[in-house]
């Protein structure tokens, strides 16, 4: 697809992703939704939301204008998290939801992501129909002057409904926990205080003052070291860091150690399994999850299923085979019993619930996963597909794997966006992992590398 990537349409705001493009997306998207609407007598309803980056307002106005010109009833949610949109689309009986965000990326980037009425990503077929319309040399879609135009209404109660939903995902409150929260100056900034106060948590916040320019800037789930310091400074038992659009959560234990998505999935998976609530006793992960997670799951008598990198592939696998917990090392964790996508605040609340129920410190809960040292090297290559079929490269990978004898792993995969081959290994020690990666990288460079 030309415009839609795995996470919607992305680009640098106002140059790559322009207001003109947002308007056209609104018109084309609105038209496709109208064509597919089951009930032709009512106007399709679309929820529109954004994160806190300054370009969000510009793109939101343009996108809504496009939707209105195509006859859509728009409910404007304002600033809310991506999983908040996925949830509200379902309960407001909307035909689609649109989130304007570039998630954990820098402030200059922005994106437009569509959700279907079921709260999952819009189907590839519908995205392709939208792309075809965007590629037409001339816009020939209908342009009603009065009857047939859409209307827009603000829907501030969306945030409240979503907050109440999150609070009801656990059976009791979280009193007795001292928490530090990093809102990444993003979409969770205006939610955290309300939710954690309602749940009786004692909490301190940082990075919850968005100014349009400071989203993800040295804070949030991609920079958890900021929260790590804050946790120790405040003497908190646990820290939670979200990203700009609130679909990720990374935790920090009481000592300031970073607890990534792998460890969060293990802790929550084991807890659910012990209560008979983990479907098929299986956790769905991507190939980037650490070997330490698999060893810990195995030791706890749990299974794992692997997918390619990307939270959408995790969700696809979960839906296909009926699993209810999955996610990525980056902190996208999906609790399919509650929501259709990775939800940072939901994940944080579930993790705090496990701490309260077990009475254990986060460092204790996480200690059951021993993370293997990992090294990743990107090699520029002429043809990344051909590199994977090169006999000498295959041979060195096999040699290294044989030497590891199950106490390490190798993953060599092409980059999704650049002419790079990513060479990753995990082993018991830093020395071993460096030696293994260097051996493979030397062969890759000699065979297909370009300087």
Swiss-Prot record:
Phosphoserine PTM sites in chain numbering: 103
Reactions catalysed: alpha-D-glucosamine 1-phosphate = D-glucosamine 6-phosphate
List, alphabetically, the GO terms of the cellular component aspect.
cytosol
Name of the molecule in the record: Phosphoglucosamine mutase
Q: Which organism is it from?
A: Lactiplantibacillus plantarum (strain ATCC BAA-793 / NCIMB 8826 / WCFS1) (Lactobacillus plantarum)
Q: Which cofactor does it need?
A: Mg(2+)
PTM summary from the entry reads:
Activated by phosphorylation.
The residues the record assigns to binding Mg(2+) are 103, 243, 245, 247
Which residues participate directly in catalysis?
A: 103 (phosphoserine intermediate)
> Mind listing the GO biological process terms from this record?
carbohydrate metabolic process; peptidoglycan biosynthetic process; UDP-N-acetylglucosamine biosynthetic process
